Amino acid sequence: MDQFSGGGGNWSMIPNVQAQGNFGTPTNHDQQLFLQQQQLQQQQQQQQQQQFHLQQQQQTQQQQQQFQPQQQQEMQQYQQFQQQQHFIQQQQFQQQQRLLQSPPLQPQSLQSPPPQQTMVHTPQSMMHTPQQQQQLVQTPVQTPQQHQSLASHFHLYPMVEKLADVIENGTRDQNSDALVNELNSHFDKCQQLLNSISGSLGSKTMTVDGQKRNVEESEQLLQQRRDLIVEYRKSIEEIVTMEH
């Protein structure tokens, strides 16, 4: 210390101590550490966000996978129903084609034993007057137009003409009896065929109506599930946008 003497006494001067380091200003090393910490924090935040998005995507995929098997089953059921309808329509069309295009049946031989006698070929019925016999013969001919194909299919018109000739002549023999029996058997076959066709058509219409109702119900269920899936996706998208 330097001493000075003055009027008021001795004065001593305190030397200035210079600061050897700047403690207030950060160094480059501190700045690098700070930047590294910030980068690590940002990376951790990004990783957390990515993990969160991955979890959400996995959840959506799992939920979609749960809905997909149900949709596939419903589509398979709908396709099977369409195939069944197509098959039924094909069967109906084939039956109609067979009725129209099948080869004619060979007439039975006149020497074949007659089947069970009906009211037409009993002895009493054959003893009627020619007018009554003509009425009995003409009644099967007056069938509706829709049955004309069956009559032509079984070759009924020639036999009816032959029977009319026999009745007009008034002669009765084995040939006329066999002709009457053959005609009756053919008409019985026609009646059985018509009954079977009408029964099959009625049953098929009932099954088709029931299948149509099942298809409508399955379509309604499919539409409801589609709407639910769309709403679920919208809600997930809204949640993701809100978090961003």
From Swiss-Prot:
Compositional bias segments (type: Polar residues): 13-28
Positions in coiled-coil regions: 212-239
Region (Disordered): 1-28, 96-131
Gly residues: compositionally biased ranges: 1-10
Tree of life domain: Eukaryota
Keywords, comma-separated and alphabetical: Coiled coil, Nucleus, Transcription, Transcription regulation
Biased composition (Low complexity): 96-111, 122-131
Localisation per UniProt entry: Nucleus
Any one GO CC term of the record: mediator complex
UniProt subunit comment: Component of the Mediator complex. Interacts with MEE14/CBP1.
Role noted for this protein: Component of the Mediator complex, a coactivator involved in the regulated transcription of nearly all RNA polymerase II-dependent genes. Mediator functions as a bridge to convey information from gene-specific regulatory proteins to the basal RNA polymerase II transcription machinery. The Mediator complex, having a compact conformation in its free form, is recruited to promoters by direct interactions with regulatory proteins and serves for the assembly of a functional pre-initiation complex with RNA polymerase II and the general transcription factors.
Family as reported in the entry's similarity comment: Belongs to the plant Mediator complex subunit 9 family.
Name of this protein: Mediator of RNA polymerase II transcription subunit 9
Species: Arabidopsis thaliana
